[in-house]
Amino acid sequence: LVHTKHAERFNRLLGEAGASNLRLIQVSELDPAIMLQLSQRLDRGEWLAIAGDRVPLHGGRNVRVDFLGHPAAFPQGPWLLAGLLKCPVNLLLCLKQQGRYQVILEPFADAVQWKRNDRQQMIAQWTARYAERLGQYCLQAPQQWFNFYPFWKTDDDLDP
């Protein structure tokens, strides 16, 4: 799942590059039919990937949690999807260490669950846990966490 209006173009380029088994889906396309498709794909053993540290640039639901000692916005989407799809969550990271890339696949949550009245609280808790774990990896390799926008910028920073 991606936060880009260019998902269709990326899908075409992936196909041209021989990666036709990958499909990028724009998060704004999510509807009940696509959610059903995602559920069926997960049931077949396929994987769903979404960046847990990227919020939409304009609007979108996010949660502010502590990240490396500062409040930061993280998307609700990964946790909402995991709960709705009743699927486990893994962390996937890549670090360059001693000149070699190390791909890390780490089980993170067997299930994200909530009751109707505590959904927001549970999503905030999972987001905080994720931010804590991501922060540990960022401290381990601070030059390898890439953001191309002011991550900690808040709406308050826009005021004169």
Label each PLM-derived region with a short phrase:
Residues E16, S20, P32-P160:
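Non-catalytic C-terminal accessory region of glycerolipid acyltransferases
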